[in-house]
Regions:
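Long, acidic (Asp/Glu-rich), low-complexity accessory segments flanking structured domains
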Residues: 22, 28, 70, 168-180
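Active-site-proximal helices and loops of the catalytic beta/alpha 8
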Residues: 11-14, 18-29, 44-50, 54, ...
Length: 514
């Protein structure tokens, strides 16, 4: 039997294992702590993420990057590597290592945002204007710290006049030309593959659980396969022997382009951008969309196969108009809708879920475009990123939004753990924007996104008893701080949700039972 399983695993190939996030203690959801300092992430793992049941953290790129002063220290400078030294606005290598160990020690996995398609922009100049002082020349395409020289870039392969990607309808230029002017690495070269693999392996050996691989649409699947094939197994201090790194690849596929997500399925998971774009449209009730249409949410909506998907309501790009998704994306700027959309995602079984944790910036729209979409994290005048202070009510200060700490979202991360592995069940809808569904007999959630009250008795599939709603409050000792839901011996319960409630949804689960 054992041999059979081993043989089957070998047949599936190593890559099948790169779809597994290796989460621990029955935890399921990850959170993107966008632009957080390593020291703050370490503290957050210990004081909040582990006790709240979060499975992992996506961290901002840890490599050294170009310093951009105009605009002043934009968040996106971190997507322009100048060396693979582990030194950034989030902290140095020592702080990174300390964070990875401390998070692992409390069972929270670290997933690294790996920017390996390119180095800095072609107009990045020459000098030591890297966050930790490494010298480089964008003009001569030299990055001696790695080292990469002009031989390691793709320009000879690119056939557009500008050297940039001009037409997403041409797969060759999407892979071989410069993405918004960023110096494009020649990943077909064994030398480049080796340097990228060394970078990833250093992080794997330090204890990370995997990677969000940036800009995969712009890399050939065959090149990625070669690089992934060189990755070490995860560090056995924290993971079982033979564990492959979890890989989730950023490919924006909303349809209509020659490059599809499908080309990357065998290599790892892929970001499902249709998910947040559609969910936003539904909760905003645009284009005639209704929540009741989500009965077949998931593959039934034309999303990728469930085992391939990494899902999210918003990400660091589309919450500020970068990348794809457009105006429908719901972010913390629309808190009521955002909480509902995130709760829907966390209640639903489709995909590996990622929660966004943002910083605030001064939004300033001119003709529909945010002039300040570049603004970096809360920082001191000298560009140093500010720590994340925790207020007495458990929210964050100094411009850090901390959506993952909002009671409704945190409690739904717990809900997802409690119902893990249970089937989508007991669907109900009013043919409009009131819907309900359960997860086996372990959890049940009811949404009212109509402009009128919800007042209905539903089959929850749950054992009879008194349950605390984990949205308006939660279980606290022998009582509930919010609504109490009484489930009868027949599994039926009465729900009442005013459209004017602060939150127009209710959720109960096995562990919120009194
Ligand atoms: C500018 C001009 C170019 C010109 C170039 C000359 O616009 O026409 O050729 O100068 O050097 C920044 C600037 C951009 C600038 C570029 C190079 O915004 O104007 O080009 O730097 O200096 C982030 C930001 C980008 C930013 C980039 C690098 O979103 O604005 O570019 O970091 O700092 C596609 C991709 C997808 C991508 C998405 C945004 O398929 O992969 O666009 N998403 C990922 C990340 C994203 C990141 C990158 C990829 C690049 O999630 O955050 O882009 O690593 O859909
Ligand atoms: Ca490329």
């Amino acid at each position: 039997m054992h041999l059979f399983i081993l043989a089957a695993a070998a047949l599936l190939g190593l890559s099948a294992a790169q779809h597994n996030p290796h989460t621990k203690h029955g935890r399921t959801a990850m959170v993107h702590l966008f632009e957080w300092r390593w020291a703050d992430i370490a503290a957050e793992c210990e004081r909040f993420l582990a006790p709240s049941g979060y499975a992992g953290v996506q961290i901002s790129p840890p490599h050294e990057n170009i310093v951009i002063n105009s605009p002043w220290r934009p968040w996106w400078e971190r997507y322009q590597p100048t060396s693979y030294n582990l030194c950034s606005r989030s902290g140095n290598e020592h702080e990174l290592r300390d964070m990875i160990s401390r998070c692992n020690n409390v069972g929270v996995n670290i997933y690294v945002d790996a920017v390996v398609n390119h180095m800095c922009g072609a107009s990045g100049g020459e000098g030591s204007h890297s966050v930790c002082g490494s010298w480089f020349s964008a003009n001569r395409k030299e990055f001696p710290t790695i080292p990469f020289t002009h031989w390691d870039f793709n320009d000879h392969k690119c056939r557009t006049g500008s050297g940039n990607i001009e037409n997403y309808g041409d797969a060759d230029q999407v892979r071989d030309c410069r993405l918004v002017g960023l110096l494009d690495l020649a990943m077909e070269k064994d030398y480049v593959r080796g340097k990228v693999a060394d970078y990833l392996n250093k992080l794997i050996d330090m204890g990370v659980a995997g990677f969000r691989v940036d800009a995969c649409k712009h890399m050939w699947p065959g090149d990625l396969s070669a690089v992934y094939g060189r990755m070490h197994n995860l560090n056995t201090t924290w993971f079982s022997g033979g564990s492959r790194p979890f890989v989730f690849q950023e490919v924006i596929d909303l349809g209509g382009e020659p490059i599809t997500s499908r080309e990357y399925f065998h290599l790892g998971r892929v970001t499902e951008f249709k998910y947040g774009a559609k969910l936003g449209t539904i909760f905003r009730k645009w284009n005639g969309e209704k929540l009741s249409y989500t009965k077949s949410w998931g593959e039934g909506w034309g999303f990728m196969p469930e085992g391939n998907a990494l899902v999210f309501v918003d990400n660091h790009d589309n919450q500020r108009g970068h990348g794809a998704g457009g105006a429908s994306i719901v972010t913390f700027w629309d808190p009521k809708l955002h909480k509902m959309a995130v709760a829907y995602m966390l209640a639903h079984p489709y995909g590996v879920a990622r929660v966004m944790s943002s910083f605030r910036w001064d939004r300033h729209f001119v003709n529909g475009k945010d002039q300040n979409d570049w603004m970096g994290p809360p920082s001191h005048g000298n560009g140093v990123t500010k720590p994340v202070p925790i207020n007495s009510d458990q929210t964050c200060g100094d411009g850090w939004v901390c959506e993952h700490r909002w009671r409704q979202i945190k409690n739904m991360a717990v809900f997802r753990n409690v119902v893990n592995g249970q089937p989508h069940a007991n669907w109900w809808d009013n043919q409009s924007n009131q819907v309900a569904f359960g997860r086996g007999n372990r959890g049940f959630i009811v949404f009212n996104n109509d402009d009128w009250n919800l007042d209905v008795t539903l089959n929850t599939g749950m054992p009879g008893g008194a349950y605390c709603d984990v949205i308006s409050g939660q279980k606290d000792g022998g009582g509930c701080t919010g609504k109490l839901i009484q489930v009868g011996g027949d599994g039926r319960a009465h729900f009442k949700i005013s459209n004017r409630d602060e939150d127009t949804f209710v959720a109960i689960h096995a562990e919120s039972k009194l």
